[in-house]
From Swiss-Prot:
Protein name listed in UniProt: UvrABC system protein C
Coarse class of the protein's main subcellular location: cytoplasm
Cellular component annotations (GO), alphabetically ordered: cytoplasm; excinuclease repair complex
Species lineage: Bacteria, Bacillati, Mycoplasmatota, Mycoplasmoidales, Metamycoplasmataceae
UniProt KW DNA damage keyword: yes
GO biological processes: nucleotide-excision repair; SOS response
Function (record text): The UvrABC repair system catalyzes the recognition and processing of DNA lesions. UvrC both incises the 5' and 3' sides of the lesion. The N-terminal half is responsible for the 3' incision and the C-terminal half is responsible for the 5' incision.
Gene field: uvrC
Quaternary structure and interacting proteins, as annotated: Interacts with UvrB in an incision complex.
C-alpha cells in the first residue's frame, strides 16, 4: 500500500485502546506500539505530531499495519511486550540498564520478623511487607540491614525466640518508625547504647553501633522535612540529543535522598514513546513512588501509562528545589557523557555496517554470542552474551551449568548444550539476527545442527582464535574462513571474543568456588542434608551462605552451627 491507501485504511481503524504493528512490504514487523486511541495515534505519524530522526526512516519503509484491540491498559502493555519479544522489531528500543538495585525488605510473619536485602520486588506486596529502597549497588544497604537485624531480632546478643505475634507486630512498627526518620529519638537511643557498650568495654558492639549511627546520621542529614510526609517520591529529569535521552532519577524515602541513578535511554521513534518505555521497563522491578516530580513538558506528553503513575510539575517550593537538584545532576552527567555516548553509538553503527559487508543480512539489531569454559571437562559451563545495536546488552546475558563429558570433542558438544538451554527457556527471545560461536568450523556446524533440531532459523558465523588465543579469522555464512583486513572491525570482533571469554571464565570460577564451598559446608559438625537445604532455600547459593552474618545464619540453623559456618570450623 502507498501512503494514501494506508491513511484511507487508518480512517476505518478502531478508536479503542490497543497495540499496533507497522509492517514493511514483505510483512516484516518494523515497530510495535501501544495507544489509548489506535486511530488517533496511527494518524499522528502522518501529520508530523510524532517526530524524531527515526520516524522518517520508519515511515519510508511502512507499507501496511495491523492492530489488536485491548480492554485495558494492562492487557495492552502485556501484549505489546509479547509482540516485541516475538518480532524483535528494528525500531523498538530496549533499555540497556541491567543494574538491579537492592531493597531492604522487612516482612512480618506469624511468629517472627524477616529482615533481608532483596533485588526482586513483589509489587503486589501486602501491608505486612515493607520495602525500603532502592539503595545504590555495592554499598549503602548492608550497614542499615545489620543494624535493623540487631535491633529487632536480638536481645543481649541472643536471638529472640518464642515471642507471641503481638511482640513481632510491635517490632515491625518500630522498624517502620526508624526508617521514617520522623525525629531523633532512635539516633539518641543508639548514641546512649554505644556509650554504654564502650563503658562496659564491649568495644566490638560499640564499634558496630557507631558505624550504624554514622550511616543513619548521614541519611538523616539529607532529609528534606517538607517531603517527610511522603513515603516515596522519585524525581525524574531528562534532556535529549539527536539519538539519546539522558536522565537522572533521585529517590526520596520519607524525605531522605537514598539513591541517585544516571542513565542513557535510546531515542526511539519519538521522545514521548521512549520515555513511556523507560518508565515501564525501569519500574517493572521497582516500587512505584507516591508521586513523580518531573519537568513541565512531561505532563504534555501522551505517555499512555497506567493511573498508578502520578506526575507533579512544580513551579515553586520544595518540590521545585528537588527538581532543580535533579536538573543540576543531569547537566553534570550530560556534560561528562554525551560525547562519549555519541562516539560509542557511531562506532557501533559503523562496525555493524562493516561486519554486514561480509554477511549481507537485512539487519543486525540483536546478536547473541555463545562460548563455554572448563578445565579437563570438570564443572563445564556455557554462556550467551547479547549485543543490541552493536552495544553490550547485559540485561540479556545468560549462563548455564553444562553436563560434563569425557570424550575429546566435548568442547563442540558444549556449544550444543548451551544453545539448547538458551533457546529452550521461555525467558529468552528467539528472534535474533545473528549467532556467533566462539570457535571454528566444528562449532559453527554444531550450532547449525542444533538450531535445525530446535526449528530455529538464525544465521551463524564463528570467530576463530590463533595459538596465542587471539582473534584470527571469521567463519562466514558459507563456512569460508575469512581474514578480516579492516583493522577497526578486527579489533571490534576481538573485543566481543574477549567479553564472551571473560563472562564464561567468570561463571566457571564461580561454579568451581560453589563446588568447593558445597564440599566444605557438608564437613561442618551438626550440619546435615536437611539443614543444608534450609540454608540453600533461604540464601539461594553457597556463596551467600558463607557471606551471611552469624545473626542471619542463626535464623535458619542452631546458633552453634551458625557460628561454625562463620568461623569455617570444618571437620
Amino acid at each position: 500500500m502507498d501512503k494514501n491507501e494506508i491513511i484511507l485504511k487508518l480512517k476505518n481503524t478502531s478508536t479503542s485502546p490497543g497495540v499496533y504493528l507497522w509492517k514493511d512490504a514483505k510483512q516484516n514487523v518494523l515497530y510495535v506500539g501501544k495507544a489509548k486511541n489506535l486511530r488517533k495515534r496511527l494518524l499522528q505519524y502522518f501529520d508530523g505530531a510524532i517526530n524524531s530522526y527515526k520516524t522518517s526512516k520508519l515511515m519510508s519503509l511502512v507499507a501496511d499495519f495491523e492492530v489488536y484491540i485491548c480492554k485495558t491498559n494492562k492487557e495492552a502493555l502485556l501484549l505489546e511486550k509479547a509482540m516485541v519479544d516475538r518480532f524483535n522489531p528494528e525500531f523498538n528500543i530496549l533499555l540497556l540498564d541491567d543494574r538491579k538495585y537492592p531493597y531492604l525488605k522487612v516482612q512480618l510473619l506469624k511468629d517472627s520478623l524477616l529482615i533481608t536485602l532483596s533485588r526482586k520486588v513483589n509489587t503486589k506486596y501486602t501491608k505486612n511487607t515493607l520495602y525500603y529502597g532502592p539503595f545504590p549497588s555495592g554499598y549503602g544497604a548492608k550497614p542499615i540491614l545489620k543494624l535493623l537485624q540487631h535491633e529487632a531480632l536480638y536481645e543481649s546478643g541472643l536471638l529472640i525466640k518464642n515471642n507471641d505475634s503481638s511482640f513481632w507486630v510491635n517490632q515491625f512498627a518500630k522498624i517502620k518508625e526508624i526508617l521514617s526518620f520522623k525525629n531523633n529519638n532512635y539516633l539518641n537511643e543508639l548514641t546512649n547504647k554505644m556509650h554504654t557498650a564502650a563503658n562496659n568495654m564491649q568495644f566490638e558492639l560499640a564499634l558496630f553501633l557507631r558505624d550504624g549511627l554514622t550511616y543513619l546520621k548521614k541519611l538523616k542529614e539529607s532529609q528534606i522535612i517538607e517531603l517527610s510526609q511522603y513515603k516515596n517520591i522519585d524525581v525524574f529529569a531528562y534532556k535529549t540529543d539527536e539519538k539519546l535521552i539522558y536522565a537522572t532519577v533521585l529517590f526520596y524515602r520519607y524525605g531522605v535522598l537514598i539513591n541517585k541513578v544516571n542513565l542513557t535511554i535510546p531515542l526511539g521513534i519519538s521522545i514521548d514513546e521512549s520515555i513511556r518505555v523507560f518508565f515501564e521497563q525501569f519500574y517493572a522491578d521497582k516500587i512505584l513512588p507516591d508521586n513523580f516530580i518531573v519537568q513541565e513538558e512531561i505532563l504534555k506528553y501522551d505517555l499512555n501509562l497506567s493511573s498508578d503513575y502520578k506526575f507533579i510539575s512544580p513551579k515553586i517550593g520544595t518540590n521545585k528545589k528537588v527538581l532543580d537538584l535533579a536538573l543540576l545532576n543531569l547537566n553534570d552527567y550530560y556534560e561528562k557523557e554525551h560525547l562519549i555516548m555519541q562516539n560509542q553509538l557511531e562506532k557501533a553503527d559503523s562496525m555493524l555496517s562493516s561486519l554486514n559487508k561480509y554477511l549481507n543480512l537485512p539487519k543486525l539489531k540483536n546478536i547473541v554470542i555463545f562460548d563455554n569454559s572448563n578445565i579437563n571437562n570438570i564443572n563445564p559451563v556455557g554462556v550467551a552474551i547479547v549485543y543490541t545495536n552493536g552495544i553490550k546488552n547485559k540485561s540479556l546475558y545468560r549462563k548455564f551449568n553444562l553436563e560434563a563429558l569425557s570424550y575429546r570433542s566435548a568442547d563442540v558438544d558444549y556449544i550444543r548444550q548451551s544453545i539448547t538451554k538458551f533457546f529452550s527457556s521461555d525467558k529468552n527471545t528467539k528472534d535474533f539476527d545473528l549467532i556467533i560461536t566462539d570457535g571454528g568450523l566444528q562449532q559453527v556446524n554444531e550450532a547449525k545442527k542444533t538450531l535445525k533440531v530446535l526449528g530455529i532459523n538464525i544465521p551463524v558465523i564463528g570467530l576463530v582464535k590463533n595459538e596465542y588465543h587471539k582473534t584470527r579469522a571469521l567463519i562466514d555464512l558459507n563456512l569460508n574462513e575469512i581474514y578480516v583486513n579492516d583493522l577497526e572491525l578486527h579489533n571490534y570482533l576481538a573485543q566481543i571474543q574477549i567479553e564472551v571469554d571473560r563472562f564464561a571464565k567468570s561463571h566457571f570460577r564461580n561454579r568451581q568456588k560453589i563446588s568447593s564451598l558445597e564440599g566444605k559446608l557438608r564437613n561442618i559438625k551438626g550440619l546435615g542434608h536437611n539443614m543444608e537445604q534450609k540454608l540453600l532455600n533461604h540464601f539461594k547459593s553457597y556463596a551467600k551462605i558463607y557471606d551471611a552474618s552469624v545473626e542471619e545464619l542463626a535464623k535458619i540453623v542452631p546458633f552453634n552451627v551458625a557460628k561454625s559456618i562463620k568461623n569455617k570450623d570444618y571437620e
